[in-house]
Regions:
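Short helix-coil junctions and helix-kink-helix linkers
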Residues: 34-46
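Short capping segments at the starts of secondary-structure elements
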Residues: 25-35
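Short alpha-helical segments that sit at the start of domains
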Residues: 1-22, 47-50, 54
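The DNA-recognition helices of helix-turn-helix-type DNA-binding domains
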Residues: 29, 43, 55
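A short, conserved structural fragment
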Residues: 56-67
Length: 67
């Protein structure tokens, strides 16, 4: 299971609206991608997954694995 936690970022001006919404959802703590998307009503699943992966690649959020 992979959960994501938010990281400090200075990329606010270049984030999309969806990325900001995802980053704000993670203020409560690490969540799985499906839980993040569930907390964003009306959001397209595939668009949100793309944004989550893009944010992880950019370092805005950090993947945490349960090993």
């Amino acid at each position: 299971m992979i959960r994501y936690s938010r990281q400090p970022t200075d990329r606010w001006l270049s984030m999309t609206r969806l990325e900001v919404r995802i980053w704000n959802v993670l203020h409560e703590g690490p969540l799985e991608a499906s839980e993040i998307i569930r907390r964003l009503p009306g959001t397209d699943y595939f668009e949100a997954m793309d944004a989550i992966h893009r944010m992880a690649k950019m370092g805005d959020i950090k993947p945490i694995t349960d090993d």
